[in-house]
Each structure stands twice: as structure tokens, then as C-alpha cells.
A protein has these predicted regions:
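Acyl-donor (CoA/ACP) binding surface of acyl/acetyltransferases
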Residues: 1-32, 63, 67-173
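A short helix-loop-beta-strand connector motif used in the catalytic cores of GNAT acetyltransferases and
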Residues: 53-65
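Juxtamembrane/interface motifs at transmembrane-helix termini
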Residues: 43-46, 55-57, 69, 96-97
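Conserved GNAT-fold acetyl-CoA-binding loop/helix
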Residues: 32-53
Length: 173
């Protein structure tokens, strides 16, 4: 199933495309946003090309761009990703620094997870965040996820490893 266009009070959630390359760099190239992200800091707009070209090609990954209705600007992205080996759907998200602490990620992810639950056989939703990333922890708590385990993860280029926590929620047994 293709990623649809969804709407919340303040956001339009839509598929990402290569046309978003310049806007995506606003957060992927910002060290404040990138601090705990799995991908390395993008040093140029072109660093995001490979990711954007791949986002809509994997049926198990549902990525959305977050468009702020008030300005029409693409301000972040997030999604839900199926892991068939574990029958778990994981969530991930990021947003431009200027939009932190406004409840926008929670608003977007509530809509995205509700859409996934309505359209797929979602049994468990999980998310992992670095210890110290209190903003991400708050989003997961507001989504109803609770502590599952201590873990760790590394950036894709192995430049940094983080102590982390995984939160989860059983949707149905």
C-alpha cells in the first residue's frame, strides 16, 4: 500500500519525494537535530538524494513528510516500519529545530500510527531513543509506549554508539 496523504490539525502528512531534497537538508544537516539520529550529519543537500530515492520503494517502510499547514513548509519526517522477523512495527521521526517542543511530532505520529493500525495487522509498536533524548522519550510516552528494554544503537557510519531505551505498546495479541 502506498503512503497516503493524511491530515492533522496543524500538519499535512504526505509521501516524500526527490523534490524535497532542499527542505530535508534543513534538518538532516543540522547538528542539533542530527545529534541522536542513526544517519550521519548531511554535509550537503545531495547527501539526502539516496535516502529520498529509496523511501517509497520498500513496502515495509511507510515514510511521511510533515508539512506545516500555516506556512506550507516541509518541516520534518517520520514513519512506521514493519519488521516481519519480529512482527513489530517501529517508529522513527525527526523535525526541524525551530519546531521542537510544539507537540507537532506527537500529533504526526499519533495520526501515522492510527493509520497503520487501521490498515495493517499491527500487533506491537516500538521505538528506540538515545538516553538523554528527552524529547523523543516524551513523544513515545504520549503515544502510549512504555519501557521495554535497555539497548544501544550506532549511527550507520559507526561514528557513534548510544546507550538507548526501547519503548513499546501491544496493540493486539
Amino acid at each position: 500500500m502506498a503512503v497516503p496523504v493524511l491530515e492533522t490539525e496543524r500538519l499535512i502528512l504526505r509521501p516524500l519525494s526527490i523534490d524535497d531534497l532542499q527542505d530535508v537538508f534543513k534538518w538532516t544537516g543540522d547538528p542539533r537535530v542530527n545529534k541522536y539520529m542513526i544517519y550521519p550529519l548531511y554535509k550537503s543537500v545531495e547527501d539526502g538524494r539516496e535516502w529520498l530515492e529509496s523511501v517509497n520503494k520498500d513496502d515495509d517502510k511507510k515514510d511521511f513528510g510533515f508539512v506545516y499547514k500555516e506556512t506550507g513548509e516541509l518541516i520534518g519526517s517520520g514513519g512506521i516500519y514493519y519488521h516481519p522477523d519480529r512482527e513489530v512495527w517501529s517508529i522513527g521521526y525527526n523535525i526541524s529545530y525551530d519546531y521542537w517542543n510544539k507537540g507537532l511530532v506527537t500529533e504526526a505520529m499519533k495520526k501515522i500510527t492510527s493509520w497503520a493500525i487501521e490498515n495493517f495487522d499491527v500487533k506491537v509498536i516500538a521505538g528506540t531513543f538515545a538516553v538523554g533524548n528527552t524529547g523523543s522519550q516524551r513523544v513515545m510516552e504520549k503515544l502510549g509506549l512504555t519501557f521495554y528494554e535497555d539497548t544501544e544503537y550506532s549511527k550507520l557510519d559507526n561514528s557513534e554508539t548510544f546507550k538507548a531505551k526501547t519503548f513499546s505498546k501491544i496493540v493486539k495479541k
